[in-house]
Amino acid sequence: MEQRPKKLIEQVQDVIRLKHYSYQTEKTYAHWIKRYILFHNKQHPKDMGAKEIEAFLTDLAVNQKVAASTQNQALHAILFLYKEVLRQELDLKVNAVRAKKTKYLPTVLTKEEVVTIIQQLSGIHQLLIKLLYGTGLRLSEGLNLRVKDVDFAQLQIVVRDTKGNESRVTMLPESIAEELKIHLQSVKIIHQQDLQKGFGSVYLPFAKMRKYLKAKYEWIWQFVFPSGNISKDPRTGEVRRHHLHESSWQKALKQAVRAAKIEKKIGCHTFRHSFATHLLQNGYDIRTVQELL
């Protein structure tokens, strides 16, 4: 039987996976490429070019009112399609209307407001917010923490990039170290139960997976904040336990802020900004704070 030709989006996915880009990048690029095609009434991209790209990007800025970062994201996805998938060089100087970069001052909470919000949370969500505020981690960095990244002896946390390489080291507050140890004891029991059921593997960046073939089953590579459920990997089909989904924490935070009756625009980055501000207020020099971030 002859195999059917692959659809364009499947070709995009193949190239992204060959380059070992993250699953989030794959979803984002696929989303914008589909939007681009639908905007031009399902015309095939190989029959379009600079003029159509500019029209799409202009519409995003003028009619959709997207942020500059969103417009750039769409542009990168489309350029990837032409260069890496269609192998089509574009003589493109983008003359589209550019979305305006929004200038905003980050929200900073007082120490009392941080405590009030933390008190509205419980369990894994409360521990995660304590960690984000106490370390200056981004939400994605906190969710992607592995057991081996936590150094209780030195009271440090290793932060890794998307390829699993060490990018920086930040502090682990002594005030939450014991609570984190107890949490990891519970996580270890869950991991052992998963292994007994024939599961227990965890996602690893490609370079790490290739170098350490059995590492995905090892305790040290498990996520510090695992999901409550095992699920099927959308790329490989392997059933395993991923980390807690960011939407779960964001929903819990939103409810906590409402319960705390704090009238500020608060998101996951707020605790990172507050961490840095409070360190400076406590006498840390700005160079040290920048290194921790």
Model region roles, listed by residue range:
Residues M1-L293:
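Conserved catalytic core of the tyrosine transesterase superfamily
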